[in-house]
Amino acid sequence: MAKGRTPRSFSQRYGKWNAKFTAFSNPTVASTILTNVAPIAQGNFQTNVPKFTSVNEQVSAVLTQYGVTGPSRAIYQGYGLKVARALNRIGAGPALTNMVAGLKAYYVSAYGANPEILDAVTNIILGSPTGYVS
């Protein structure tokens, strides 16, 4: 689904690390690691999949509103997921603003994306136009 880091607490990170590396003393290492890590990975998956599914649905609604059809939708869906991953990884603030500005410039120059639609996608993901100034 989505690549990139997702925010995890120290206890989640330690739990996964502990489950992985205590298993190396067992001869069936791969099986043991997967068995021990599965509940933690499933929890992370269940936490983050709804976020990115919601992003896809929201971006799709914006694209329908602007009349974007066919393969062009993939450009804006990809942009939306990149913005959502950046928000998930680094949170709101100046770093996110810089990241979004760079992504927008890249998508405009590389893919010929419409800046107005990119702004609409950004605003729907960040929750408010006040969170991003184009």
Swiss-Prot record:
Chief subcellular location equals virion
Span-the-membrane segments of this chain are none
UniProt keywords, alphabetically: DNA-binding, Virion
Entry annotated with the keyword DNA-binding: yes
Q: Where in the cell is it found?
A: Virion
Kinase keyword on record:
no
Q: Which GO terms describe its cellular component?
A: helical viral capsid
A single MF term (Gene Ontology):
DNA binding
- Please name the Pfam families in this protein's record: Sulf_coat_C
Instruction: Give the record's subunit note.
Output: Homodimer.
What is the documented function of this protein? Self-assembles to form a helical, filamentous nucleocapsid. The capsid proteins wrap around the DNA and maintain it in an A-form by non-specific desolvation and specific coordination of the DNA phosphate groups by positively charged residues. This certainly protects the viral DNA under conditions such as the extreme desiccation of its host.
Per the record, the domain comment is: The N-terminus projects into a DNA groove.
Annotated protein name in UniProt: Major capsid protein
Source species taxonomy:
Viruses, Adnaviria, Zilligvirae, Taleaviricota, Tokiviricetes
